[in-house]
């Protein structure tokens, strides 16, 4: 008797393994791993937006592990050494906002806080208008203005319920703002 769960897992694995490095004509295990982590962390549509075009993986000279993902010459992701997940760069945030409808991965802030957050300052709960209900504590998020323009990237320090209920406290620890990339 066949196990349908195993058959399903094998089909998904075969789809993932179809990633081929066209220049070499062979499998690129690092690229497969990089895409798999992005799909797990951000979801399939967002990962596809991040990995479109020509991909260059920057690896550590010492360990050989993936450190940065460059897509069409733009730095879109950096991999954290501690847990093997990605930190999102502003170019990556722009690609996700273009490809995936709101509210996916987004925290929307009031106009009053846009100048501060875009400079790299943290986003506080009292200035948040809305957020993705699927955000988990410490997830990578995109901070946007009310017109869905990305202004910063960072990590969620509160869950959606807390963000909407609290009058004080840091909602997003901002890593980089829009003005950092200009």
Q: Locations of the language-model features?
A:
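Beta-strand/loop-dominated core regions that host nucleotide or nucleotide-derived cofactor-binding catalytic loops
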Residues: 14, 23, 36-55, 71-130, ...
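Low-complexity, intrinsically disordered regions enriched in charged/polar residues
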Residues: 3-10, 31, 90, 111
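Substrate/ligand-engaging "lid" and interaction regions
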Residues: 56-61
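Terminal interaction modules at protein C-ends
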Residues: 65-66
């Amino acid at each position: 008797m066949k196990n349908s769960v195993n058959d399903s897992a094998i089909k998904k694995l075969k789809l993932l393994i179809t990633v081929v490095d066209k220049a070499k004509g062979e499998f690129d295990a690092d690229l497969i791993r990089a895409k798999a982590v992005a799909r797990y962390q951000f979801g399939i549509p967002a990962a596809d937006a991040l990995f479109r075009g020509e991909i260059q993986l920057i690896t550590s000279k010492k360990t050989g592990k993936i450190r940065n993902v460059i897509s069409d010459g733009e730095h879109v992701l950096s991999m954290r050494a501690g847990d093997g997940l990605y930190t999102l760069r502003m170019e990556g945030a722009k690609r996700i906002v273009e490809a995936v409808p709101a509210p996916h991965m987004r925290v929307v802030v009031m106009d009053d806080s846009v100048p501060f957050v875009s400079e790299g300052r943290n986003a506080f709960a009292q200035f948040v208008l809305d957020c993705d209900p699927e955000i988990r504590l410490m997830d990578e998020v995109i901070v946007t203005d009310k017109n869905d323009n990305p202004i910063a990237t960072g990590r969620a320090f509160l869950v959606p319920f807390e963000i909407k209920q609290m009058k004080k406290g840091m909602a997003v620890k901002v890593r980089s703002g829009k003005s950092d990339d200009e």
